[in-house]
Amino acid sequence: MAAALVGVSMVAAGTLAGVGPAAANAPGHPGTPSAPRTVFTEGFENGEGAAVTPLPDYTGAAPQGQTYAADPAWLTSCNGLLVSQQAPASPPAGVNCGGFWAANKQMAAALGTWAGGDAATNHSLTAYTSGNPGAGRTELETVRPIPLSAANRFLAFSVDAAAQNCFTNHPLLAFYLLDGGAARAAFSSPIDPCQNPGQVIGGTSVGTYASNGSVLFSGDSAGIRLVNEQASGNGNDGAIDNVRLLDATPQLDQAFAPARLPVGAPTTLTFTITNTSELAAKNGWSFTAQLPAGLRLDGGSAATSCGSGTATADAANGTVTVHGDLAAGQQDCTATVQLTSITGGTYQVCGSAITDAVGVDLPGCASVTFTAPVFDARSHGVRLTSPLLDIGPLAPSAHSCTPLPGEDDHSVLSAGLGSVGTLGALTTDASGTIGADGSRTAAAHARTAGVNLLGGLITADLVGTSAQARQPLTDNGPGAITLTGATTLTNLRVAGVAVAADAAPNTTIGLPLVGSLVINQQTPIAAGKGITVTALSLTLLTGVHVTIAQSTAALLTTTDPCPAS
């Protein structure tokens, strides 16, 4: 049939490209129409040979085994006959074809040539009116319902038609799709092969004609009715072949752009509704998309280019609902909505998330990845390193190497550091939190009581630290990181001398013949994305290093290395 579709002319619609048993629109090709799927076709060839068969006596091919009816006016006076070029030279008795029998055979042969088949054996339904049939009479109607794959499908039709004697009254073929007892027009004007031939073969005008409209069926079966609007029997001579019922349901696709971005930054979810290749009008389709938890819709951002359609975003429920139309000749249209997420991760939307789909084929999957800052919150009560022995970290707490919120805390009652000294209770915690506004905070705390080092050279009732890294969320993603760090000193004494509770950061005290002590040590880390605060950092000449009450807080990117504890 492909050859027949080149140069097809249209009355009822634009040309029908690629009609055949091709698959319906497949997801993944937004904006590129695919051929409509053939639901039913009748070529009037089942069991036919040289003999002439009246339309009511014909049964179509299995599994449908379709039969046909017509108004009496279209079953008499040389009408309603299945004819081929190989039919007998004389018409069957009682068909009243007079001297026009050969013309019936010529039209069947011309339709066979047009379709790229065998002109001699091709059968067509012919009508060479030798009387006035009257307007609006049914020339062909399916008797058995044609099953559909599902409800809420757009249906269209296609037919090969021929006509002779175009100098007088033309056949005017009006096709209807039957929805239960209702006949629904799938055209804007009747097919007139005389006025719009795809080709003239031996004096016979022929063409393939597709509906420029479509019918949205809610049921699971359909029928076809051909009504000839020409009342006169003067002229009105024609034939039809290759009647097709087409599932011309548009394809829905969905895509995110950009598909990878920071949390808080907006991405656009685009729904593309792509017509089938006959480009008939598709009015009244609709669907609702349910987005996964974690995505935040911009309720005022929904928009559509789909005719007089509407697009609405329900931010509270995470749904997008679209109603729209495709005009005749329109390849596609779109609906868009903006959204974001304050939680890092990959979110996928698939066809299973589309509910209340009417007149669209479900899409494939689309995904978007939001990259989130990574929490790095760590603390410990004490750690000792030396050339011979390491102790700790003791009472370590950590919430690190994850974009997800969480917390950790630990404590011990006391700690011994060998010849270096003793400590009382150690308590620590570390956490990562996400605010309702999307801001992220990494925080850590450490407290060490009962400090007694180097035989009383360094003592304190309590030392503690806190570290925090906070990052707000802006309309374009994570903002600048704010770092804070503090040290608590209660009755700290070094060599019997009291140290101010508000000692400045990185206060260093030399310990002659012993080493040095840094108080309220504050060190930026991760290229300024974090801070480490240590209450007491003791370095001995023997190579021993002790950190007491240390807290670290940072907000890292996904490309930063995961920190050691």
Q: Where are the regions that the model predicts?
A:
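Extracellular carbohydrate recognition
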Residues: 136-138, 229-248, 359, 545
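A surface/secretory-pathway sequence property marking extracellular, secreted
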Residues: 178-193, 286-321
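Extracellular carbohydrate-recognition regions
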Residues: 26-105
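Extracellular carbohydrate recognition and processing domains
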Residues: 182-217
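Low-complexity, intrinsically disordered segments enriched in Ser/Thr together with acidic residues
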Residues: 138-145, 206-213, 323-346
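Surface-exposed, low-complexity/disordered Ser/Thr/Gly/Pro/Asn-rich loops and linkers
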Residues: 77-151
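Extended, solvent-exposed, non-transmembrane regions
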Residues: 371-565
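Short beta-strand elements of extracellular/lumenal beta-sandwich folds
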Residues: 263-283
